[in-house]
Design a protein with these regions (language model features):
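Long, well-ordered mid-to-C-terminal structural blocks that present hydrophobic/aromatic surfaces
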Residues: 232-277
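Beta-barrel outer-membrane channel/assembly domains of diderm bacteria
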Residues: 1-111, 134-146, 196-197, 203-230, ...
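Short, catalytically relevant binding-site loops at active-site mouths
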Residues: 189-190, 226-228, 260-264, 319
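Surface-exposed coil loops of outer-membrane beta-barrel proteins
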Residues: 66-90, 99-194, 199, 203, ...
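Conserved active-site beta-strand-loop modules that form the wall/rim of enzyme catalytic pockets
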Residues: 180, 254, 311
Length: 374
């Protein structure tokens, strides 16, 4: 709508086609092939007296190959590709900005906190996760963003709902030129999966700063403590840390990191049930649930752009949280390009090489994707 957005509002359109293949050496499962097309169609009203509303419909449909287990179609003999044929009200919220430096948003909404490690929308899957919730964002203090919220229900990536009582606080202070210091508290009380109920308290400092005119240092340090909460009958305590160091220079980004989720036995491990898990610990999704002995992920990433084409490679070495038991290694590769503001293409590949000491098997994943949005 351009300049008429303030008068008439905005229509949001997002169409995404994807072919995905999941092929493992698991003898009891056949290779999964999924050809799907996802549509999101929404309308954002003009702002009136500080109020604004948004409604968004989302649907995902098979478009060709459909030999896969979507977790909803009953095809349990195939590998899981969690993109079911469903349609849903993805977002439906009302916001108010009439208070100074404050926005209050109520309803079904997308929530992405920090890097999505604890609360995110799982945006990689065709149908994202959204939350029936209240979110208050305040920026009254200099360089500070305070987010306080309460989640009553999560609409999952397979279009089911999980009732919960989840208050959260996320406070971030930006040190200009150096990075952002964030402290957080997430209290998840999950009615559907009580073993996923936990309370997490943590902090992070992340940023980048110039070293020379052509080189920037990249860094992140994060620590969190987690224990059981409310309906979880398993009494446990576990720690989490994530350290990244790297540099950007001459159009190339290089990073190395170690991420560790503590664990000691079944149901006594650090878990992040509302995270965008695909963004962490390898794209083959071997560790969306933390193993009983915890997880240590030592990884390295290299990325650049060539004529507007982004190229990325990532290597992971997985072990238990002591480093004494090897789970396997993974190589991930991505090529993607945006064409103007509205079009995009992507190809992605992941190969997980399981260690014989783990209960995993070798797995290959492959994706081709095309997107159109405005």
């Amino acid at each position: 709508f351009g300049q008429d957005d303030a008068k008439y509002g905005q229509i949001k359109f997002d169409l995404r086609y994807r072919f995905e293949q999941d092929d493992s050496k698991l003898a009891t499962k056949d290779k999964g092939d999924a050809s799907t097309i996802r549509l999101r169609l929404g309308y954002l009203t003009p702002e009136v007296l500080g109020f604004q509303a948004y409604a968004e419909y989302e649907t995902n449909q098979d478009f060709g190959a459909n030999t896969y287990n979507s977790k909803r179609n009953g095809k349990v003999g195939y590998e899981v590709i969690a993109d079911p044929q469903e349609h849903e009200l993805n977002q439906f919220w009302l916001s108010y900005k009439g208070l100074a430096d404050t926005e209050v948003k109520v309803g079904r909404q997308r929530i992405k906190l920090d890097n999505d490690r604890f609360i995110g929308n799982v945006g990689w899957r065709q149908m994202e996760m959204t939350y029936d919730s209240v979110l208050v964002t305040n920026q009254s203090l200099p360089n500070t963003t305070i987010k306080v919220g309460y989640i009553n229900q999560a609409q999952t990536i397979i279009s089911t709902v999980q009732a919960m009582q989840t208050p959260f606080v996320n406070i971030a202070y930006n040190f200009e030129g150096y990075g952002k210091l964030t402290g957080y508290s997430y209290l998840i009380d999950n009615n559907e999966n009580p073993n996923q109920s936990n309370q997490t308290y943590g902090f992070s400092f992340a940023g980048k700063t110039p070293v020379t005119d052509d080189v920037k240092a990249i860094y992140r340090f994060e620590y969190a403590y987690q224990k059981d909460y409310e309906q979880n009958v398993n009494q446990y305590e576990a720690d989490y840390f994530h350290v990244i160091g790297g540099a950007e220079a001459y159009g190339v980004t290089a990073k190395a990191g170690i991420e560790q989720l503590g664990g000691s036995s079944e149901n006594n491990v650090f878990q992040t049930p509302l995270a965008t898990g695909h963004a962490f610990n390898g794209w083959s999704d071997q560790f969306l649930t933390t193993p009983d002995d915890g997880l240590r992920d030592v990884y390295a990433l290299l990325s650049t752009k060539v004529h507007g084409v982004k190229i990325m490679g990532v290597y992971h070495d997985f072990a238990d949280d002591t480093g004494s038991m090897d789970y396997g290694k993974e190589w991930d590769f991505l090529v993607t390009k945006k064409f103007g503001k509205h079009y995009s293409l992507l190809a992605k590949y992941a190969y997980f090489d399981a260690d014989t000491a783990s209960n995993k098997v070798d797995t290959q994943n492959f994706w081709l994707q095309a997107g159109l949005s405005f």
